[in-house]
Amino acid sequence: MLGSLVLVWVAACLVLFVWPPAEGSAPAHADAVVVLSGNKRRLPPALALIRRGVAPVLALSTVQRTRHWPQAARLCAAHRYAGARVVCFTAVPFSTRGEARTVAGLALERGWRSIVVVTSTFHVTRARMLFKRCYRGPLTVLGSSSTWWELPKEWASETGKLLVQLSVERGC
């Protein structure tokens, strides 16, 4: 019985966190590329999108920018990257829900009608759910890969957080 439950959980984790339902690739144009805080590996794919000219704005959730994320600190200090404006924000509360709420507010305030959110692949399912609850415009959520040794911890954490979002905290 326990073995069956573990097998079902692993299968669900593979579907939700390793190979989440794809939205395709990044759109040809968006008003902003948003990088969620929490992992330095999220920044390079976002920078590649900016270099390709996908969006004129790079928005960084920067609670970790000082000591843990020096590249983000440099981008925030420069205010520009590859011709794009860099907007740095700190979500309140510091959570994916807080980031979704903050970005929805920034989108209204700054006239962003479409956004691309870059996060870790394991986080795509929950981030997409929360951003769709808070942000009303066209949305693409893309994932950056994680190292294999981080996956068990990420799966356990995301499983709990996803269950909370599905059962208890159902709004924006």
What are these regions (language model features)?
Residues 18-156:
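A structural signal for short, hydrophobic/glycine-enriched beta-strand patches
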Residues 1-16:
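Hydrophobic membrane-insertion alpha-helices, especially the h-region
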Residues 151-171:
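A transmembrane-helix-recognition feature enriched in membrane-embedded lipid enzymes
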